[in-house]
């Protein structure tokens, strides 16, 4: 039993000290538990362990949260661990039920719910001590009252928060057992750090962090102090830091954040400063750099950015035209997905129509002077958005006809609209079953029907994909829709288990809550090549070991895109009263994150920043430039101007031919390999156009798109939004 702290400079997840402690635990207990920072790292480390004979069997690898959930199943009580969705539902419920006097300066807004949802997992078990401290403002005291009610609600419904779970596990976990080894796990919350420290009194706990020399290692050193306490003794791992293939890169790593005049890095061409003279040539500048590095023998690239989606949209097609494979893990919010928006439109329309149908029960249809009442719901535009989506099971022709008939009837009754939807002969079997599930308040069942329908379609498409060996846009969309609908089902199941019933009045609140949830979708540009480019946020670099890529590009190195993260003022102020434990500064984290990303390069690295007025260098870029002779970046940086337009600014062009202006129409034929990522080519037959736009819009016999009145109104509100929502670019 005891706590062992290690500083390691290799950056490997299986450093010498980690392997030694795993072997010792296996020898004594027959098993060991290794905690790593992310699910991506879990897969990487499992492959590495499989190649080491002594560690190939008996080592369980997981993230901390996964391990905590497993431990709760073994040693926890009958109470259930709370999800983030349910946490927000409970807080919103409590806030809505409080009077204005009880709320004080608090509001019932989404921001208040977010703030409370961040506080509860960490400080709920210490609420009494926080209140007794007597240093809270009126607003903070009101927040504590909400937390107190929340605590009582959890007890009533048999749920536990993270901090309560960890406190319970400290008591119930057996005195003896396999070692718990942490490798490169950064930024553990305060509740988790306390748990690790106290658990070391019952089990062997090893905490190993990557601590590079200089300011980049300050954050890790601070976290080791938080785990072990002030003045704790840390052992130093015997492994040596691996060297990059480029001496210039090694020198830069040794000097960044601690540059001194007269001790500059000697340039050799391994580090490049890209300075496009405008946003239109930014992507061309990056793609050309990748091409040049590929010609020099580089095979693997990472593009670190603060806006992965924007960079992916702009760069993936450019790389595809050059025959370079690109990958990206896309975080899709439910409200940004086609299926999520369509389902939200259905819920919105159903809630409105069901309320209207209740009012219509009191209308005497036979009376000549009967009043229609409020008709602001007519026409049911959100319903049409659902009908033309892939999750309705209704053909585009039928959806278009229904929309046309509803708009042509100014005395339309909501009751008749619902009757139409609930009859399979008039809509579709899927639509009718979905409506009937909603009538029973079973939103999970409604989503499950859609999942079954999409699963059947996906199975058929996958069979076609196996034959054609190509993944179509439609099949990718179905996979995304399946993940989104599964997320909605799991959220609905959580509410059901918590005893919360969904009514037509609460359906909208539920779907609003679901909209902000996200699913992860791995995407690629469809190119098969040994040259691979990963587009990722900087924080993802913690999932990689040093020198994992041949070349690394930092995109958008200005203060706006690559600045030091600002902390939540209200949250920080509350935490200051709730905890006396010192925190790791945001700037120390910034230095650590940049260095961790920088060291993933083995051969070359590029720093890209658009040259424009009133946009300043990011701190990290200024620190890098300080390692070089004065004005070195200006003299040697690669600038791409906009004054001479190049054809290769277009995604599908490859030759750097200079022209006076960009062509207004495409020339030549599109490469067949690229057709899957071209959403709306100019020259299409009726058949191919119908295939491309299936489930989106109607196509006439002449091969022209037909739009319903609802679609035209939506388009006129915001054309750009209309096109992007339908993935037409």
Where are these regions (language model features)?
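C-terminal, charged and often intrinsically disordered regions of DNA end-processing helicases
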Residues: 292, 625-729
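ATPase/helicase motor core of nucleic-acid motors
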Residues: 52-60, 66-76, 262, 291-302, ...
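Conserved helicase C-terminal RecA-like lobe
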Residues: 390, 394-402, 434, 446-480, ...
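PLD-like (HKD) phosphodiesterase/transphosphatidyltransferase domain
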Residues: 2-14, 18, 151-197, 274-292, ...
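Accessory C-terminal helicase-associated subdomains
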Residues: 176, 203, 269-270, 291, ...
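Basic/charged alpha-beta structural segments of nucleotide/phosphate-handling enzymes
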Residues: 36-176, 190, 217-218, 228, ...
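Conserved motor-region signature of P-loop NTPase helicases/translocases
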Residues: 1-48, 55-58, 175-176, 181, ...
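Conserved helicase core region in the C-terminal RecA-like lobe
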Residues: 38, 60-66, 179-187, 307, ...
